[in-house]
């Protein structure tokens, strides 16, 4: 009877451990999916930034429009810097940390990269709108 209990305990422990590792892996995979999405948007960001930088070098016809272009350029720059900062600070190596610490860290990182994604989407959408209206 004792042997059965010991085997059952070991089995449950192994199942619990593998479940926590799966939770950690799933959360990390989720973070990396958002990161990959943000990186795909980087081309659009750089394209818009280049166009705005070129327009800003032209002689000013309308000061308000120049201010608007500069604000859009700064939003693009800020979202690019936010992504770079997140990438430099992100540490996927969580060896020797408890499951709770790993889940908290990954949860915080998921919120951070989602914030970067949102910031970048706003900057790209607003600059796309401005640039497409300017071409008309």
Where in the sequence are the language-model features?
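Positively charged n-region of N-terminal signal peptides that target proteins for export
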Residues: 1-4
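C-terminal motif of bacterial Sec signal peptides marking the signal peptidase cleavage site
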Residues: 13-16
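Short, low-complexity, disordered segments immediately C-terminal to signal peptides
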Residues: 18-34
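Short, charged/polar, low-complexity loop and linker segments
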Residues: 21-25, 54-65, 98-104
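C-terminal amphipathic alpha-helix
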Residues: 34-42, 98, 102-136
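Post-signal-peptide N-terminal segment of Sec-exported extracytoplasmic proteins
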Residues: 35-77, 126
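Heptad-repeat coiled-coil alpha-helices
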Residues: 47, 51-54, 58-61, 85, ...
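Long, amphipathic, charge-rich alpha-helical segments that form helical bundles/coiled-coils
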Residues: 68-113
């Amino acid at each position: 009877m004792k042997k059965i209990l010991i085997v059952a305990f070991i089995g449950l422990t192994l199942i619990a451990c593998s479940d926590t590792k799966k939770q950690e892996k799933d959360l990390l995979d989720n973070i990396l999916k958002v990161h990959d999405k943000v990186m795909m948007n980087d081309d659009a960001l750089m394209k818009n930034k280049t166009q705005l930088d070129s327009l800003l070098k032209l002689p000013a016809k309308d000061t308000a429009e120049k201010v608007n272009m500069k604000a859009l350029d700064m939003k693009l720059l800020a979202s690019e810097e936010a992504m770079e900062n997140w990438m430099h600070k992100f540490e996927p190596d969580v060896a020797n940390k408890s499951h709770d610490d790993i889940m908290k860290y990954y949860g915080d990182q998921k919120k951070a990269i989602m914030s970067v994604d949102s910031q970048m989407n706003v900057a790209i959408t607003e600059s796309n709108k401005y640039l497409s209206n300017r071409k008309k």
